[in-house]
């Protein structure tokens, strides 16, 4: 495996870009390696600048549910670009994507487009505070909702990877309005509401936590959050930036039949281009300017290229059998992977839901932040390096999720399993 060109580009990047990357986890610090610079992607594969091919289980951190360079998505982007890359004015494409979202998710009666998941969650919290007239929000240990100041309190994703649960630069005045509960622990939520019953504007939660590895909601947890928030007059916000359109044509809320007050989206709804969205009931969304008094704006919000890519992606998901294909591939891969893990004396575990999965270097059941943190990150780093040598690209952090796309096939599954088996045999004998 050659990496000379990637090493050269990383050195050059560090001269001009902090840390040489534009998002921390990409630096590969958590796996003790230099990052790979990717040249192109097609289907289930990516190719680095040194000519190495990898089966990709990062999929741009979730947006590429159809795989890389899907012909219909590429065509939609090209056709939109030929007419203009940005207008700073309303365009028909944004109505089309908004309608697709609203028709797919019953709780979303109106939706506002933004440019990232961070913008979506930040704007949703501002709206919740204005609507309720309250200041506090409740989030959960290890859950990541973007990098707005009020979310960088015991957060997940890159902050877990870096070992910094609360980012420097977040004023105490912001932090004191963010209350932190334990995922899958309703009692911890009840205690916070008991302490500040009239001050909590909203509870924001990943209905399937995907930023401390994959952690599934236990039976009754999401239902309990809905009951508690209603009882105290707070809003419930589902952060479906990862889970939206991942498991079905809609949100995870469609599957569990729970309607939050607000929903945030991103990733898949942009088809690989920068996008975010937040939506909910009309009486809440109509507080947003220019209809109401809660301000939010963006130069590139509703960008025609992102809207076209997102609409093309959602239409394919709605019309085809992608979800059945995703489940079949994931069941095949993870079913056989469980057999491999069982050979290692209870030192490994795995969580899966549909086309998301995480392999943890701990034998304990992973159900919350504290159990995630028992993972052996050193062994994961070694494992990751062995996978790359075998042509399999997993997230460069123990605390991120693997994504399966509709482009992955049985050939990919077979090679992945052989590579994982070999990598684990070597990793687990290392001290």
Swiss-Prot record:
CDD domains per record: OAT_like (cd00610)
Aminoacyl-tRNA synthetase as UniProt keyword: no
Signal peptide: none
Top-level EC class as recorded in UniProt: isomerase
Molecular functions (GO terms): glutamate-1-semialdehyde 2,1-aminomutase activity; pyridoxal phosphate binding; transaminase activity
Pfam families: Aminotran_3
Cofactor dependence: pyridoxal 5'-phosphate
Pathways involved: Porphyrin-containing compound metabolism; protoporphyrin-IX biosynthesis; 5-aminolevulinate from L-glutamyl-tRNA(Glu): step 2/2
InterPro entries (UniProt xref): 4pyrrol_synth_GluAld_NH2Trfase, Aminotrans_3, PyrdxlP-dep_Trfase, PyrdxlP-dep_Trfase_major, PyrdxlP-dep_Trfase_small
Principal location: cytoplasm
Modified sites of kind N6-(pyridoxal phosphate)lysine: 267
The enzyme's E.C. designation: 5.4.3.8
Compartments where found: Cytoplasm
Assembly information from the UniProt record: Homodimer.
Family: Belongs to the class-III pyridoxal-phosphate-dependent aminotransferase family. HemL subfamily.
Name of the protein described by the UniProt record: Glutamate-1-semialdehyde 2,1-aminomutase
Organism of this sequence: Syntrophomonas wolfei subsp. wolfei (strain DSM 2245B / Goettingen)
Gene assigned in the entry: hemL
């Amino acid at each position: 495996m050659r990496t000379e060109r990637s090493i050269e580009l990383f050195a050059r990047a560090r001269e001009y870009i902090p840390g040489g990357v534009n998002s921390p986890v990409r630096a590969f610090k958590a796996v003790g390696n230099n990052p790979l610079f990717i040249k192109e992607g097609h289907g289930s594969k990516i190719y680095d600048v040194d000519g190495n091919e990898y089966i990709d289980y990062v999929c741009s951190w979730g947006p590429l549910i159809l795989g890389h360079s899907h012909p219909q998505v590429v065509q939609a982007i090209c056709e939109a670009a030929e007419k203009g890359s940005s207008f700073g004015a309303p365009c028909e494409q944004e109505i089309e994507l908004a309608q697709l979202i609203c028709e797919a998710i019953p709780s979303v009666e109106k939706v506002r487009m933004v440019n990232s998941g961070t913008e979506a969650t930040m704007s949703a919290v501002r709206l919740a505070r204005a609507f309720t007239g309250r200041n506090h929000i409740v989030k959960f240990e290890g859950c990541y909702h973007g990098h707005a100041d009020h979310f960088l309190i015991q957060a997940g994703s890159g902050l877990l990877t870096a070992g910094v649960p609360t980012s420097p630069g977040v004023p105490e005045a912001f932090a004191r309005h963010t209350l932190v509960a334990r995922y899958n622990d309703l009692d911890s939520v009840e205690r916070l509401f008991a302490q500040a019953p009239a001050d909590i504007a909203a509870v924001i939660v990943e209905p399937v936590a995907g930023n401390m590895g994959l952690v599934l909601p236990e039976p009754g947890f999401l239902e309990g959050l809905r009951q508690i928030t209603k009882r105290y007059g707070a809003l419930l916000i589902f952060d479906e930036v990862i889970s939206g359109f991942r498991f079905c044509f809609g949100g995870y809320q469609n599957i569990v039949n729970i309607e939050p007050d607000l929903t945030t989206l991103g990733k898949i709804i942009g088809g690989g281009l920068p996008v975010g969205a937040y939506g909910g009931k009309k009486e809440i969304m109509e507080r947003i300017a220019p209809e109401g008094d809660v301000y939010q704006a963006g130069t590139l919000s509703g960008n025609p290229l992102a809207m076209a890519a997102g609409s093309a992606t959602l239409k394919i998901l709605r019309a085809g059998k992608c979800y059945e294909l995703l489940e079949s591939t994931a069941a095949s891969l993870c079913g056989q992977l469980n057999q491999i893990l069982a050979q290692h004396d209870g030192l490994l575990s795995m969580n899966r839901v549909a086309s998301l999965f995480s392999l943890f270097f701990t034998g304990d059941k992973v159900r919350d932040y504290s159990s995630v943190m028992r993972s052996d990150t050193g062994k994961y780093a070694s494992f990751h390096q062995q996978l790359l040598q075998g042509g399999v690209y997993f997230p460069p952090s123990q605390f991120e999720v693997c994504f399966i796309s509709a482009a992955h096939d049985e050939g990919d599954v077979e090679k992945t399993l052989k590579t994982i088996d070999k990598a684990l045999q070597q990793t687990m004998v290392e001290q």
